[in-house]
C-alpha cells in the first residue's frame, strides 16, 4: 500500500473513495493532536490572568493600571503575531510549525514559575514575560488556517468548530485547575516551590505555571508521530490585496471582533473586575464558568448555522443578545448584586459562543475560493484577538480616569450596536444573504 507520506503528498479530501480509505483516519489524527496543542496554547495564553489577581497579595506592589496592562499584553502580542502565524504552515509546513510554535511556550512557562517566587522581579521583567505568554495566543491563527485543509468542505465547519471550540476551552481549563494547583502542597514539593501566605493560606503561585511543562512535552512527542505536513499553495501578495480590497473582509472582521473580542476580553478582565467591584466574592473558584460556556457553545453555533443553512441568522440574534447582556452587566455593578452581575456575564459568554461559531461558518460561504477563505479566517481571527488586549485596557483606563466602570460599558455597548447595524445591512436585510457574495 501507499506510505503515509505518499498519501499526504497527494491529498484529495473531496474524493470520497480517497477520503474513506486513507483520508479520514489521517485527518482525524491531525485534528486530535492539533486540538490538544491548541487547548494547551490557550491554557498558557490565559496563565497570566489566573495569577494577576493574586500578585499583590503575594508581596508584589503593582498599581491597578499596571495590573490591567500586564493582563492586556498577552492579548496584544497574541493578536499582532496572528497575522504572521497565519502564513507559517504554508511556508514551513503545518506539522513543523505546530511543533516550533508549541516548544517556544516552554520558555515563558518555566521563567514565569521562577519570576513569581521572587518578589524583587520588576514590572519590566513581567512585561517581557507576559509578552512571551502572548505567543501562545497567536497559535490559534496558524492552527485554524491549517487544520481545515485536511477535510472536505462538507466537514470543514465541524472540524474548525472542534479545533477552535475545544481549543478555546483551554481558558476554562486553566481557570478551573489553577486554584487547585496553587493550593496544592504536593505539587509545590514536586516543583520545589516556596509558598506565600495569602489570607492565612499557603499559596504556591508558581505551580500554575510549572504544571504545563509535562503536558507540553507529551504533546510535542505525539506531534512527531501523528501530525503531517500537507503540501499547501504558497500565499502570494496578490491574494492579500484581494482580501483587503474587499468590503466583506471588513464586515466579517467586525462581526467576529465583536463576538470573540467580547469573549476573550471579558475572560481576561473579569477576575480583576470582580476583585475591584465585588471584593467580598471568592471569584477564583467560579472564574472558569463563563469561558467554559462560550467555548462549549462555539461548535454548537457552527452546527446550528449548518443546520438552518444560515450563519447570518445565528450571528445576528446572538449579537442582539450581546447588546442586552452588556447593558445589564453594568446594571448589576450598579445594584452591587453579584448573582445578577454574574448571570449577565454568563449570558454574554453564551451569546459570544454562538456568534463565534456562526461567524466562522459564514466565511467559506461568503468567499468561494478556499485559499482566500483560509487567509481571511486567519486575518479575521487576528484582528478579533485585539479584544483580549483592548477590553482589559479600557477597564484599567476608565478606572484610573473616572474611578468607576460605567464609561467602559457605554463604549462596549456602542460598539456592539454598530456591529448589529453592519450585520443587518450586509447580510440580513431583504435580498441579502451570505451565499457566494465574492
Question: How does the language model describe each region?
Answer:
Residues 311-359:
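C-terminal transmembrane helical hairpin of 12-TM major facilitator-type secondary transporters
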Residues 81-94, 298-310:
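Helix-to-loop junctions at the C-terminal end of transmembrane segments
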Residues 122-138, 339-354:
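Hydrophobic core of transmembrane alpha-helices in multi-pass small-molecule transporters
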Residues 48-53, 246-299, 356, 360, ...:
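Extracytoplasmic gate region of multi-pass secondary transporters
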Residues 103-119, 320-335:
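C-terminal ends and interior cores of transmembrane alpha-helices
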Residues 183, 212-233, 420-427:
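C-terminal membrane-cytosol helix-exit motif in multi-pass small-molecule transporters
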